[in-house]
């Protein structure tokens, strides 16, 4: 699958950009009001008691700030942040080494925590609950178990697939927050802040236009800001206005709803090839030349979220809004 400009997954070009734009403290963090307010209380209480913060789980779509919040927790607690990812921890010994190198109060951030294998995950249970790990040394009849004490630490887990977490792991997190998509106003505030950091001049209407097309996701908003900046510099006077933003985003094929050519291809295919549905995900995928898993996990969620596609017992159906957005005539059909 080719990389899309509007993918919310982390791209190589995002890493340096996100690092430079990432807020360091809760007061600078925009959006996620409920999670932010609760974390402020939990962190302050833990600091007053001189304890480590309870283990924290963030879940929700990619690009909404899970990694950023892990860093903020460490900064607010005044401790070190250690970062890893589920797929990178292949053996229990790898996890044991990471845990054994933590210092008192450290924050251990595990991205994609749902991808930990079972043996590694089971090593985490006593570590999270009792701050100990049991290591088996030797093999066969000579094998023996050694218990190692760990410093008190905070595990921050992040996942886009909360349903794939096992109950024993999920239940060991004392703080659980779902991160929500951002409003246009919140994204506008993020874009304005990022533009200042990047030393790019942007007016209110330009920031609003960018925010509207950013699919509720800060990562995408910052990526689009960076690309629109290039057009403003080369094609205009360097200032991002509504006109500049529209010009650049139209060239990048990101429309007013944040859809790209593949999103629109799915909608048009369903309308023209399948009379708007109901149609199965496999048929859609075959027609556009993608695998069904990619269509279901990557493309479909945003279309459903924005009311362009409905999931029904008989299959997927496009809505009247989808017809209007694609500029195609709508024939009313009763859904079943």
Swiss-Prot record:
Residues that, per the record, bind DNA: 311, 316
Residues reported in the UniProt entry to bind ATP: 21-22, 63, 66-68, 129-131, 172, 182, 219
Subcellular location: Cytoplasm
CDD domains: AAA (cd00009)
One term under GO cellular component: Holliday junction resolvase complex
Pfam family, one: AAA_lid_4
Region of interest (Small ATPAse domain (RuvB-S)), ranges: 183-253
Entry keywords, A to Z: ATP-binding, Cytoplasm, DNA damage, DNA recombination, DNA repair, DNA-binding, Hydrolase, Nucleotide-binding
Ranges where the record places region Head domain (RuvB-H): 256-336
Residues reported to bind Mg(2+): 67
Region Large ATPase domain (RuvB-L): start-end pairs: 1-182
Any single GO BP term: DNA repair
Gene3D superfamilies for this protein: 1.10.8.60, P-loop containing nucleotide triphosphate hydrolases, Winged helix-like DNA-binding domain superfamily/Winged helix DNA-binding domain
EC number, UniProt record: 3.6.4.-
One Gene Ontology term of the molecular function aspect: ATP binding
Predominant location category: cytoplasm
Catalytic activity: ATP + H2O = ADP + phosphate + H(+)
Described function: The RuvA-RuvB-RuvC complex processes Holliday junction (HJ) DNA during genetic recombination and DNA repair, while the RuvA-RuvB complex plays an important role in the rescue of blocked DNA replication forks via replication fork reversal (RFR). RuvA specifically binds to HJ cruciform DNA, conferring on it an open structure. The RuvB hexamer acts as an ATP-dependent pump, pulling dsDNA into and through the RuvAB complex. RuvB forms 2 homohexamers on either side of HJ DNA bound by 1 or 2 RuvA tetramers; 4 subunits per hexamer contact DNA at a time.
Free-text domain note: Has 3 domains, the large (RuvB-L) and small ATPase (RuvB-S) domains and the C-terminal head (RuvB-H) domain. The head domain binds DNA, while the ATPase domains jointly bind ATP, ADP or are empty depending on the state of the subunit in the translocation cycle. During a single DNA translocation step the structure of each domain remains the same, but their relative positions change.
Subunit text: Homohexamer. Forms an RuvA(8)-RuvB(12)-Holliday junction (HJ) complex. HJ DNA is sandwiched between 2 RuvA tetramers; dsDNA enters through RuvA and exits via RuvB. An RuvB hexamer assembles on each DNA strand where it exits the tetramer. Each RuvB hexamer is contacted by two RuvA subunits (via domain III) on 2 adjacent RuvB subunits; this complex drives branch migration. In the full resolvosome a probable DNA-RuvA(4)-RuvB(12)-RuvC(2) complex forms which resolves the HJ.
The protein's name in its UniProt record: Holliday junction branch migration complex subunit RuvB
